[in-house]
Amino acid sequence: MDSISQNDWLKAKIRKRDISYQSARGRRALRGVALIYLTVLLLIPLFVIIQDGLREGLTGLWHQVTLPIAWNALMLTLRTATIMTIINSIMGTLTAYALVRYDFRGKTLINSLVDLPLAIPTLVTGVMLVILFGPQQALGALLKEQFGISIIFAPPGIILALLFITFPFVVRAVQPVLLDLDRTQEDAATTLGAGSWTIFRRITLPPLILPVTSGALLSFARAIGEFGAVVIVAGNIPLYSQTAAVYVLGEVESENRLGASAVSIVMIAIAFGLMMLVDWLQHRKN
């Protein structure tokens, strides 16, 4: 009897070891597939463009980046992305607050429309803005004649396109936090006579700082590389409305691969730094 029990115990132990070995082998295979995919899809292209941009060293890269047209394109990209980020951080937070805290007719439709910019091709976004604000259109002509504001083929058009494309990021970053927020303190503050603005500023807003910042950084990173809508609305005018992404296309078409790679490296570095910061903020929030 004892011999049978011992044999069963040994068989069970062997089966458990085999299952554990197969599971470990499966995990290693899965990791290997993921690493190979990541290497082919992301790391090799990054390595190639960095190697190409640095083939004349840091001095050559700096020379290409500081050329007047390239530098102006980078600065315009950063300026328009910054303005867009400030506006969308405010409006995205207010939109998320309205969608979470208030019930109104058409709320479901508006909540669905928030994600529409992510689904629409950015070229279509550019065409819509040209049709609406073009110099030959009623609204575009009115803004130009009455206020001296040009939207299309000018920096304001770039900002408008970026506002449309990146609008969902802050809204979707803030909404889950508002949904999970305990409203006990807000109710207590209301009972004690605090006004709605005081409650929002002192109680509701502080927990939203991290998600708003994360959404803002994602918006900024997305805006840096935007091409489709910008190339339609900006007009690609050097030293005026040419962004970094459009400049890179021009350098590729001019067969100046070094210039295209150099500016691309700067854009990649900025985007990567922002993504690292977003990950850090997410980790801190969790």
Can you describe what each PLM-predicted range is?
Residues 16-28, 49-86, 101-102, 251-257:
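Periplasmic/extracellular loop-to-transmembrane helix junction in inner-membrane transport proteins
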Residues 32-37, 116, 120, 164-183, ...:
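Transmembrane alpha-helices
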Residues 16-21, 58-66, 71, 107, ...:
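Membrane-interfacial helix termini and adjacent extracytoplasmic/periplasmic loops
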Residues 2-9, 29-33, 44, 48, ...:
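C-terminal transmembrane helix and the adjacent membrane-cytosol boundary/short C-terminal tail
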Residues 18-22, 83-115, 127-131, 142, ...:
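Transmembrane-helix boundary motif in ABC transporter permease subunits
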